[in-house]
């Protein structure tokens, strides 16, 4: 007996926009996203990221910020290359939202606690919470990335680089970890390594804020000083 693979019913794009747009346009974002969550799965919404209408692609990316899971990361990373800046902006937001929530519940809670410490400048406490999160879930890429940020803010750049690498091992599309590694190399005046990281970050997210400027500055520095490492 042959078992047929389960199929996912496609969403009608016009129905999708008609159902969600009124709440969005009235500013009731939560109502719109609650409706999306109740009607469609992430797998269905992902298909709309390639639809010809930019508004459909944008609303699909916004919806994935709430219902998306690990399977939505690769399609959203493709959406970072969309010709419409509004779509790439929402895709970036959706990726951050997914990255922060796809760990085990205990690890997600510890990362939130660590972020609170980091916000108040308590970097060692933040690092301890992020480390605890990693013990709870060794595959939680964002725990490594947040620990990298805490190390960066406390000027422990080598440790930050190592944690960026650990994050990227688990989430290769993590433009934040890649650009963060570039910042660390720049602070260490390792200009060629910084340039390499910035180029890779832009390959993932071509419109990543500030990175093209940093890359241009390093390119100019290396042109003016060819002996610099």
PLM regions with names:
Residues 66, 97-101, 119, 153, ...:
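Register position in tetratricopeptide repeats
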